[in-house]
Amino acid sequence: MDIEIVTIGDELLLGFTIDTNAAHLAREFAALGVRIVRRATCGDDAESIAAAVREALDRTGAVITTGGLGPTADDMTKPAIASIFGRGMVMDAEVLANLEQRWLTRFGHTLPVSNRQQAMVPEGCTILANRHGSAPGIWLEDDHGRWVVMLPGVPREMRGMLADTILPLLRDRVPKDGPVIRSRTLRTANIAESALADRLGELARGVNGMPLAFLPGNDGVDLRLTSWSLPSRDAEGALTQAAALLREKVGRFIYGEGDDDLAALMLSECAMRDLTLAVAESCTGGMLGERLTAIPGSSRTVQGGVIAYANEVKTRELGVPAEMIAAHGAVSEPVARAMAEGVRQRFGTGIGIGITGIAGPDGGTPEKPVGTVWVAVDVEGDVRAVRALLPGNRFEIRYRAAQLALDRLRRAFAREAGDDAVGWTSRG
């Protein structure tokens, strides 16, 4: 089944609000085996809404809209779409009664006149109950089987109605043994998109007939495999086989799948090894500590940290010799190592991590340009350091430096099994 999505609202069109509805719909429909072939956004204008929905119906015969079902003058979705089907608008007594009861129960007063508009619906439509808000959804279908579902634009309401009503209805219309859309995401760190493509070779074009998408972000590059044409019973097995082929090529850079978070994975690994951890941060300014402590239960592993931004703090709080900083500079391998060793000894932990770098936009030199970062990891006295040149703005460099530190901890653990690979960011 093919469907098009039309999201409605001036706030979306002008960029004041991020359209999270379309992304959520696409993910949920893909899991159901429904293919989204096009997404469109239009403003709160009746002609634009009618044109966008009419064109979508002509292509697929099935459209989901979000937005424009509220009580104000700019909520034009229902009459605009009713006009496409040649339907008039009528007051639905049951919807009106529900609205009146809702206002009396929740707010203790009668329904405002403006909200009566929400009880106006296209003739011959099916009302879709909305237990998450005031605006009901609408299902409108013609004699040729073409249909439009209108959902509220408020994300919480839209998601609730999708789960309560729309997905069960569509599930009955999707062939039980037909092809489904399934995907598998492998998460990588410390390697660039181009370097991944080079290592994958022909697999970068697709694996066993499945397309492979490269999705770069601050966490690293995600590799997403998608099966479009297999029944549900075969898709997962095919994805597992394809993922195994990718792991053969770039497995040392893969730290997880799906929504796996590297910070959470490292905390779990530390707990399994009965190791505690402390961090010493300069350019990241506490970002690594924040990522770790944002995870429930992190207090069992994370003992503390030091934000050693000034050189004097590096010396006073972490024991980094002032003469070392003078000789090598604050952004150097010896200083990063001393920070990791110093914070581990200060907090009495099994692991110490030190990060020092130049996040920019100022402070770079030809020898140490903006983005230069040194990360050191001390695991029970075994200290290893890596230099990286990270791209991006100040926030991106700081975030990627924290991610690099987590990945170096992962590699420190993996070296026990012989994995001593260094990613693309290494510079010396």
From Swiss-Prot:
Disulfide bonds: none
Stored CDD domains: cinA
Cited Pfam families: CinA, CinA_KH, MoCF_biosynth
Listed SUPFAM superfamilies: CinA-like (SSF142433), Molybdenum cofactor biosynthesis proteins (SSF53218)
InterPro entries linked: CinA, CinA-like_C, CinA_C, CinA_KH, Competence-induced_CinA, MoaB/Mog-like_dom_sf, MoaB/Mog_dom
Family indicated by similarity: Belongs to the CinA family.
Protein name in the entry: CinA-like protein
Species assigned in the record: Gemmatimonas aurantiaca (strain DSM 14586 / JCM 11422 / NBRC 100505 / T-27)
